[in-house]
UniProtKB/Swiss-Prot annotation:
Family the entry assigns: Belongs to the MoaC family.
Residue positions of the active site: 128
Cross-referenced PANTHER family: CYCLIC PYRANOPTERIN MONOPHOSPHATE SYNTHASE, MOLYBDOPTERIN COFACTOR SYNTHESIS PROTEIN A
Binding-site positions, substrate: 75-77, 113-114
Classification lineage: Bacteria, Pseudomonadati, Pseudomonadota, Betaproteobacteria, Burkholderiales
HAMAP family: MoaC_B (MF_01224_B)
Organism: Burkholderia multivorans (strain ATCC 17616 / 249)
Function: Catalyzes the conversion of (8S)-3',8-cyclo-7,8-dihydroguanosine 5'-triphosphate to cyclic pyranopterin monophosphate (cPMP).
Record's subunit section: Homohexamer; trimer of dimers.
Catalytic activity, as annotated: (8S)-3',8-cyclo-7,8-dihydroguanosine 5'-triphosphate = cyclic pyranopterin phosphate + diphosphate
Name of the molecule in the record: Cyclic pyranopterin monophosphate synthase
Length: 159
């Protein structure tokens, strides 16, 4: 298990010690998609969902999700985030919605988990607010698309 940082030599899970790492600017971007029926897409696009502003509520939920990541992922370090930006892109061709989250901090560990959690919580909120009209929505294609900072350097997913 030498390549997995969250396990010790005996194979027991532990929280990684980041105390000796240098503090640097850390940035991560993640994205994901929720696919839905055309009628559901139209409700969101036209702002006519019964529960209100779907994407506005989902944006706040995504930000809250990023802030609460350490409460949800057992071995994730609690971080003082300096920025969480969440955007939604409507995609007529799917039909569906893409969620993109960029999370930043100045610290000793990356913010990939916070960006992924923001995207998932944002998309789950879209599902929650629209499930009365479309229980068949599908969340998928969630991934980190970019990370910057830290000892391992910068990384960007292949397009």
């Amino acid at each position: 298990m030498s390549g997995l940082t969250h396990f010790d030599a005996a194979g027991h899970a532990h929280m990684v010690d980041v105390g000796g790492k240098q503090e640097t600017q850390r940035i991560a971007v993640a994205r994901g998609t929720i696919r839905m029926l055309p009628a559901t897409f139209e409700l969101i696009r036209d702002g006519k969902a019964k529960k209100g502003d779907v994407l506005g509520v989902a944006r706040i939920a995504a930000i809250q999700g990023a802030k609460r990541t350490a409460d949800l992922i057992p071995l994730c370090h609690p971080l003082a985030l300096t920025r969480v930006a969440v955007d939604f892109e409507l995609d007529d061709a799917l039909p569906g919605v893409h969620c993109i989250a960029q999370v930043e901090t100045f610290g000793r560990t990356g913010v990939e988990m916070e960006a992924l959690t923001a995207v998932q919580v944002g998309l789950l909120t879209v599902y929650d607010m629209c499930k009365a009209v479309d229980r068949g929505m599908v969340i998928g294609d969630v991934s980190v698309t970019e990370k910057r900072g830290g000892k391992s350097g910068d990384w960007k997913a292949q397009a």
